[in-house]
Design a protein with these regions (language model features):
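Transmembrane-lumen/periplasm boundary regions of multi-pass, lipid-linked membrane glycan transferases
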Residues: 47-49, 68-77, 198, 210, ...
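Extracytosolic helix-loop segments that constitute the early lumenal/periplasmic catalytic or substrate-binding loops
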Residues: 25, 37-74, 81-93, 274-283
Length: 526
């Protein structure tokens, strides 16, 4: 039976290919979220800046002198050439020109997620040396609804998470080869330097990965009983190569810093206290990003992580002696654990602004998965494989049921609490496409306007460009009736508009709960 399963799972990469095809297709069916237009606008500004520098153009790029210049261009360096290819292969219907540009980035985000799955598997395999376990747990990770949902549209956090995981694998391989006296080619250090710089170009908080590098380095030094100076002497050239490539490409990926390198310091300071006026509904409280309780990360982790992962974390302390009797776990599991704890501790101590559930620490979720799954493997491989298989089936069912709102998934503890009132819902605005489709199918009365807080997302999918769209701030002004009100994202909490009737509602049911979770509403006001 075991050999049969192993032979079947030798087709993992065939599965990954079809997974990529299906996921890429589905990503094009997801609405346009609020971050996408802004990110693309910043990229356009950076392109204009490059044209100003190299071709003596005179475009206005003054916005890059503000905090907008703190965003790198890494994602778009990759997405732009792929986009050109997709334009010739994919024909997206019922979307305007600008919307088409934004939607074509969705499958590219999904590519990053698939790459993260490849390196997730590599890390699990490094620790367990068990192909069957590595394949199954990677499928578990790839079908996890919360991250899968984000991989359909999240142009910032998913690429960042994926590249972090790639760099984690690279630092493990490089250190392992160095300390085991295996020749490491210079291109490995150059690659790590480039990808570390690329990580910063996705999010300036990528600088945190040096904490992970340092922790791994300390564990390897200690385990091999090598003094720092004895390590430094034969490896100083390689360290210099890494740092040089890192610094060079960090500046290359940030055109707005070319004339003033010290802006990097401003970027680190600004992004650590990123201004966010919205609050995140957490257990019924609207927690403000600037004044979060220390429990914020732990509450969302408790409800977002799968039960199998929570169980692995729960039994970790009881298996500590067994786990760290193995050298592999000391060199891999221990540093990964220290990395997660250190970063979370620093975020809490420095009161870093966090919002929108776990998006700022999403890059830690694959590492938390790896930690928990390694613990479970050491606890009982057989039981873990059975439970993992069950969760994969359950996740597939949930993904089909929730699409395109997969990212809103909560674990089964949701049956003990009313999600609609106690947690943030469609805060990204994925429902824009479905709402637009509803408006398209149900012809609006002549000259009737639509008032919404997400006009920028809805407009791309409207068949008629003549539909009157008004900002949400116009709701309490004198408007010609009839008119329509679309409430989504955080505006859902503002109550029912006066003299308006609910005519459509987007909602989901999570897991086994029968609770209807409202995501968007359309009202007709007469």
């Amino acid at each position: 039976m075991k050999n049969f399963l192993q032979n079947r799972l030798n087709t993992f990469y065939i599965f990954l290919f079809f997974y990529f095809i299906v996921g890429s297709y589905l990503s094009l069916s997801v609405g346009i979220t609020h971050d996408e237009a802004h990110s693309n606008w910043v990229w356009e500004l950076n392109k204009k800046k490059l044209l100003n520098i190299f071709f003596n153009k005179e475009y206005d790029v003054s916005y890059l002198e503000t905090y907008h210049g703190f965003y790198g261009i890494g994602f778009y360096l990759v997405s732009t050439p792929i986009e050109i290819l997709y334009k010739n292969l994919v024909n997206i219907k019922n979307v305007d020109f600008e919307g088409n540009i934004l939607l074509l980035k969705h499958p590219i985000v999904f590519i990053f997620f698939v790459i993260s799955g490849i390196f997730f598997r590599k890390i699990i395999l490094l620790v367990t040396k068990d192909k069957l376990f590595s394949d199954l747990t990677t499928i578990l990770y790839l079908t996890y609804p919360y991250i899968l949902g984000h991989s359909f549209f999240n142009v910032k956090d998913i690429p960042f998470m994926s590249v972090w995981l790639v760099n984690t694998f690279l630092i493990i391989k490089i250190l392992d080869d160095i300390f085991n006296k295996i020749l490491v080619k210079k291109k490995a250090f150059i690659t790590l330097g480039i990808l570390t710089a690329y990580l910063l170009s996705l999010r300036i908080s990528g600088i945190l990965i040096f904490i992970e590098y340092l922790i791994f380095f300390i564990f390897y030094l200690n385990n091999f009983n090598i003094k720092f100076l004895n390590f430094l002497k034969p490896n100083i050239k390689n360290i210099f190569i890494f740092l040089t490539s890192f610094i060079f490409f960090s500046f290359l990926f940030y055109p707005s810093f070319w004339l003033d390198p010290f802006k990097f310091l401003d970027a680190f300071k600004f992004m650590s206290q990123h201004i966010q006026t919205a609050c995140t509904v957490t257990l019924g409280d609207c927690m403000k990003a600037q004044n979060l309780p220390t429990s914020y990360i732990f509450i969302w982790s408790f409800f977002k992580l799968p039960l199998i992962i929570l169980f692995g974390l729960l039994i970790f302390p009881f298996l500590e002696k067994k786990l760290f009797s193995l050298k592999t776990n000391i060199l891999l599991l221990a540093p990964l654990t220290c990395t997660v704890l250190s970063i979370i501790f620093l975020l809490i101590i420095f009161n870093v602004n966090l919002y929108d559930e776990l998006r700022q620490i999403m890059f830690l979720i694959p590492i938390i998965f790896i930690i928990s799954l390694i613990v479970l493997y050491n606890y009982s491989k057989k039981i873990t494989l059975i439970i993992t298989s069950f969760f994969i089936i359950f996740f597939i069912y949930q993904n089909i049921k929730l699409f395109p709102y997969n990212y809103l998934w909560l674990n089964n503890f949701n049956i003990f609490i009313q999600v609609d009132k106690n947690f943030e819902k469609d805060y990204w605005g994925v429902s824009t496409k479905k709402i637009a489709n509803y408006l398209n199918k149900n012809n609006l009365e002549n000259n009737a306007c639509v008032i919404s807080n997400r006009n920028e997302g809805i407009k791309h999918f409207l068949k008629s460009s003549n539909i009157c769209l008004k900002p949400f701030s116009d709701l309490h002004k004198k408007n010609n009736r009839p008119f329509y009100v679309v409430m989504m994202e955080r505006s859902l909490n503002k109550g029912t508009p006066i003299n308006c009737t609910l005519i459509h509602e987007e909602s989901i049911k999570i897991n086994l709960s029968q609770e209807k979770v409202s995501l968007a509403k359309v009202y007709k006001c007469i």
